[in-house]
Amino acid sequence: MFKATTSARHRPGQGNSLSTLMARYNNQGLQRYSLKDKEHKIRRRKRSWGFQHSVILKNSWALPLLLTIVLPVIYAIHPVESKFFGHFILLSYRHGSVTDGMAFPVAQYKKGLWDLAFVAFYANALFLARKFIMKRLLRPLALKNNVSTMGKQQRFMEQMYTACYFAVMGPFGLYVMKTTPGLWIFQTHGMYDSYPHRSLGPAIKFYYLLQAAYWVQQSVVLVLRLEKPRKDHMELTVHHIITITLIALSYRFHFTHIGISMYITHDISDLFLATSKSLNYLSHRLQTPAFCLCVIAWIYLRHYTNWRILYSVLTEFRTVGPFELDWEAEQYKCQLSQFITFGLLATLQTLNIIWLYCLLRNAYRLLFLRIAKDDRSDTDKSEIEHGD
């Protein structure tokens, strides 16, 4: 009599629709979870890198200290058995001596791959010296002279370290130039007339490789961002790349006499620049005359003298000494090397012109507006206007 009834009749596709909704909901949840998980991983990586970078900054002296102490100790204990370690500490490839026009024999050294070990060791040593001098000697000096803010202290220490290094290497470079025939006072003829310079005296080789070690160390500082990037960070990066390239090519292909002159022009001008900037941080009364001397030295060395060297590459490079490519005789003074040398030096000169513009603008501000500020550097918000 009575028909069976149901509270709800099954509709075709209802179960599938519900399953689809549930699947979509689950997928959306999984996507949200996946996005959150990715964001969490990114934040964790950033925190991890920040921690690692902090550890590197705080302990950047550890590896240089270890290498600087261990290698000389091993070599001192067993100098014969530790000939391998001797390549890191002493000059390699000695091959006789010369007495031509000299009171006593002077050792001569060839070039080879072990010279890279020497550069690597002294780059580490300079890295350690930089850390020690800045933290133990220059920071107390900054505090004693009321350089209060951390930004100014860091810049002051960086510039003073640079001044200390070039105060040693500048005169040493002049000594090397003085004792190298035909180079004194930036004579360009002597750069080419005795080419190729396959063997070097101990002073020249040590000077050249130590300078290479310094620029390797400076490049590491730049890559690890151990110094706060300046506004001219890009120009500085290009400068370091060009410098390392010039050092490597000039050493390998026997153009070291050109390299000596280029070293000196940049070292002495950098000495004046770093000294004037350091006096600026100290608000010293000599900062204005020091900066004026810096501009004069910069124009004479990095422009007048460098332009003379550039001109000699276009003229004397071809006419003085041999001009041919002979791989067996290690004779590389040819049209290709002339083009490469001029291109690299011209690029370096372009960077120097950019920095000269900054110097002249700073000179105008200092002399006429009484503002002692280097506009190449980033200034901390806590620093006053007269900071770097």
Curated annotation (Swiss-Prot):
User: How does it sit in the bilayer?
Assistant: Multi-pass membrane protein
Q: Which residues are glycosylated?
A: 146
* InterPro entries xrefs: Lag1/Lac1-like, TLC-dom
Q: Name one Pfam family in it.
A: TRAM_LAG1_CLN8
Give the E.C. number(s).
2.3.1.-
Q: What class of enzyme is it?
A: transferase
Consequence of gene disruption: Does not affect the production of fumonisins B1, B2 and B3. Double knockout of FUM17 and FUM18 does not reduce resistance to FB1.
Asked whether the keyword Chaperone is assigned, the reply is: no
Domain TLC spans what residues? 151-368
Gene Ontology cellular-component terms for this entry are: membrane
Q: Which UniProt keywords apply?
A: Endoplasmic reticulum, Glycoprotein, Membrane, Transferase, Transmembrane, Transmembrane helix
Known pathway: Mycotoxin biosynthesis
Membrane-crossing segments per the record: 60-80, 113-133, 166-186, 204-224, 241-261, 339-359
Q: What triggers expression?
A: Induced by exogenous FB1.
GO terms in the biological process aspect are: ceramide biosynthetic process
The GO terms describing molecular function are: sphingosine N-acyltransferase activity
Report the family membership: Belongs to the sphingosine N-acyltransferase family.
Q: What does this protein do?
A: Sphingosine N-acyltransferase-like protein; part of the gene cluster that mediates the biosynthesis of fumonisins B1 (FB1), B2 (FB2), B3 (FB3), and B4 (FB4), which are carcinogenic mycotoxins. May contribute to the biosynthesis of ceramide via interaction with Cer3. Does not confer resistance to FB1. The biosynthesis starts with the FUM1-catalyzed carbon chain assembly from one molecule of acetyl-CoA, eight molecules of malonyl-CoA, and two molecules of methionine (in S-adenosyl form).
Q: PANTHER family under this entry?
A: CERAMIDE SYNTHASE LAC1-RELATED, LONGEVITY ASSURANCE FACTOR 1 LAG1
Q: What is this protein called?
A: Sphingosine N-acyltransferase-like protein FUM17
According to its UniProt entry, this protein's organism is Gibberella moniliformis (strain M3125 / FGSC 7600) (Maize ear and stalk rot fungus)
Q: Top-down, what is the taxonomic lineage of the species of origin?
A: Eukaryota, Fungi, Dikarya, Ascomycota, Pezizomycotina
